Design a protein with these regions (language model features):
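Secretory targeting and sorting signals
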Residues: 2-35
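Low-complexity, disordered linker/stalk regions enriched in Pro/Thr/Ser/Gly
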Residues: 320-336, 340, 386-456, 474-634
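Catalytic zinc-binding patch centered on the HExxH motif and its immediate surroundings
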Residues: 115-118, 154-192
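Active-site recognition of the HExxH zinc-binding catalytic motif
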Residues: 200-216
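Propeptide-to-catalytic entry region of secreted or membrane-anchored zinc metalloproteases
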Residues: 37-158, 193, 387
Length: 634
């Protein structure tokens, strides 16, 4: 295990090289605190730091990250760990597309002692820490080492210091100051802060805590195959006893996704193992983040997570008051959320008839020439994301909201002197990615709808209909850095963003091969007769964390983390894989996760691709090289 002092030195290096996602974490200013002075010393010493603010806490999903076992001198290590975990989280769908729904808060609470309980073994010292985190299920000999627990009451008390949050709109993630592999996903998610794999533990555990996803492991105790599943049809959305024909015929479980290339690699179908059983139960994909850390959520899990995230917020953030009838001499408006992955749809209907509004957020009733009497106007906000295929999910309150008004021509609307101005908008403090949706909301005078005019590098950008959202994907930006502005005509109001349209680049370094082969029109080929290492480095012209990924033979993209025992070491490929703590890493060819998976070497030529995902969400183009594995002589 790396010493806390070593981790502190590494954290200082990471902080001083400009890797933090947001400046707010470094220079937060005064702590956010409740008016009443907390009686608990830990609460009194806690400091709440806004890391990412996308809107009012009571209208957002709030991720509250707190550390345990970090002394005051190790605050830099906690901040660096938070940065690393968030960088990976934002690279994974659906968090990448719905990042704008989420506020992130860091709760810094100094620990009297460094580290957590029973780390790494049951005979390790018990530490005096604010959250009483511990491995082995809280130092339980009947548990497993990787089960990292937290005192839920103490965690909830710390989260309560974040104003505007409640158990209904927040997710707690507790990071332990440790390099030992571990985490848990009960009511709250836990993860070790500094393990090479720890930033991948966090989304896995949030999958449990927030999405209700289940483990796809085919073991419970490491190194021991789980045996046959003996239960009934699982309630889990991503486990089943049904055959593939039965899934189709009954339109059950993941039938809508069958046959699709899996985002986690391979094809969505029926793959045996899960729920800690080796046989007798099946999952959608050969591997996903709920089975093997490093891969993505597959489509089935991703759909569950979209609903879970969206259920924590209201797509319809605000609207023209509707508690009483309104006049026909005014405008009617709605304010919506703004996913980074694509704008929401707003459908307007008058007395059941669809109005042609071009997805606008405002309707001018004066232009409708309403007849005398009362009319009903409705606005339905829907998330059209392709991540969801189940109509029941699409039609749920998580992804569809409707508001209605009674409109009466006999009523006169009082004058409104509200000035046109910007209200909420995409943060301007960090670059936005070339495939993001940028938004700018405005005030709502009763007899006008302030227009938003967009310019890219000084040139007007047409954006009819919904002028509050601008989807940068439609602009096909040239590589480089651009300036985007939004203005309200007739006012001095202007917003300005830097658009990062140049992805980070990656480079690889391999251990010495037997030989190197260069052929015209083919990637460079390296020949090995045994294990070899691959280091991936990234460079970016913008600040922020860069995630590096690779994949073998077109399988799922896998997040590069160094090596399980050392984040600074290169990844190691070998013919049969390397067993570490009863898990298998780095088998070249068909991957292997546990010792009982097929260890037969895949001799021949393999394609290794690599790419980057930068802090703005830009996904770099994949580059590749070839590796040919030959049998050793003799």
């Amino acid at each position: 295990m790396t010493s806390p002092a070593t981790r502190f030195r590494r954290a200082i290096v990471r902080l001083t090289t400009g890797c933090l996602l947001t400046a707010g974490l470094v220079a937060a200013g005064p702590a956010v605190a409740e008016s009443a002075q907390p009686a608990d010393p830990a609460l009194a010493a806690a400091r709440v730091v806004p890391v990412q603010l996308t809107g009012p806490a009571d209208k957002r999903f709030n991720l509250v990250v707190m550390g345990d076992g970090y002394t005051a001198e190790e605050t830099a290590a906690f901040r660096a760990d938070v940065d690393t975990h968030l960088g990976v989280l934002w690279s994974i769908e659906p968090f990448a597309s719905y990042r704008s729904y989420i506020n992130v808060w860091a709760v810094e609470v100094p620990s009297p002692e460094s580290g957590v309980d029973c780390d790494p073994g049951l005979d390790a010292p018990r530490r005096d820490t604010p959250l009483d985190m511990g491995f082995w299920g809280g130092c339980n000999p009947a548990s497993v080492q990787r089960l990292l627990t937290v005192d839920s009451a103490k965690a909830a008390a710390l989260a309560g210091l974040v104003p505007g949050t409640s158990p209904a709109n927040r997710q707690i993630v507790a990071l332990a100051n440790s390099d030992t592999y571990g985490g848990a996903g009960g009511s709250y998610a836990t993860a070790s802060g500094g393990n090479a794999l720890s930033s991948l533990i966090t989304p896995h555990e949030i999958g449990h805590s927030l999405g209700g996803l289940q483990d796809e492991y085919d073991y419970y105790a490491r190194g021991v195959a789980g045996g046959a599943y003996e239960g009934t049809e699982p309630s889990s959305a991503h486990h089943t006893l049904l055959t593939e024909p039965q899934i189709r015929e009954q339109r059950a479980k993941w039938w809508r996704w069958l046959g699709e290339p899996s985002e986690a690699g391979g094809v969505i179908g029926r793959h045996e193992g899960g729920l800690y059983s080796t046989t007798g139960v099946w999952r959608p994909s050969r591997h996903s983040i709920m089975k093997t850390l490093g891969y993505a959520f597959d489509q089935v899990e991703r759909e569950v997570m979209v609903r879970a995230i969206s259920a924590k917020v209201n797509l319809l953030q605000d609207h023209t008051p509707n508690s009483a009838p309104i006049g026909a001499d005014r405008t009617v408006w709605v304010d919506t959320l703004h996913p980074l992955g694509g704008e929401l749809d707003v459908a307007w209907r008058l007395d059941g008839r669809t109005l042609r509004t071009g997805n606008a957020r405002t309707v001018d009733l004066r232009a409708l020439s309403l007849s005398a009497g009362a009319h009903t106007l409705t606005a339905t906000v829907t998330d059209p994301t392709p991540f969801v295929r189940d109509p029941a999910v699409r039609g749920s309150a998580a992804l569809t909201r409707t508001v209605s008004w009674t409109v009466d021509r006999a009523l006169t609307t009082p004058g409104d002197l509200a000035e046109a101005a910007f209200t909420g908008h995409t943060p301007t403090t960090a670059p936005v990615g070339a495939r993001s949706v940028v938004h700018a909301d405005t005030t709502h005078p009763t007899r006008s709808a302030p227009a938003v005019r967009w310019r890219l590098d000084g040139r007007p950008v047409a954006n009819p209909g919904n002028d509050r959202d601008l989807d940068l994907r439609a602009l096909r930006l040239t590589p480089g850095t651009h300036t985007l502005t939004a203005r309200i005509p007739g006012t001095e109001a202007e917003l300005r963003w830097t658009v990062d349209a140049r992805p980070a680049t990656a480079s690889y370094e391999l251990s010495t091969p037997l030989r190197t082969v260069n052929r015209p029109g083919r990637p460079v080929e390296y020949v090995y007769d045994g294990p070899f290492t691959m280091g991936l480095a990234a460079r970016d012209d913008q600040p922020g964390s860069v995630v590096r990924q690779f994949r073998v033979n077109g399988d799922g993209w896998y997040t590069y983390y160094g090596w399980p025992t050392d984040a600074d070491a290169p990844f190691r490929f070998s013919p049969s894989g390397t067993v570490i703590d009863d898990l298998v890493y780095g088998k070249l060819g068909r991957s292997r996760a546990v010792p009982w998976d097929d260890a037969t070497p895949d001799y021949g030529t393999h394609t290794i691709e690599y790419r980057t995902i930068d802090a703005a969400g830009n996904v770099g183009p994949a580059e590749s090289f070839l590796v040919t594995l030959v049998k050793p002589r003799g």
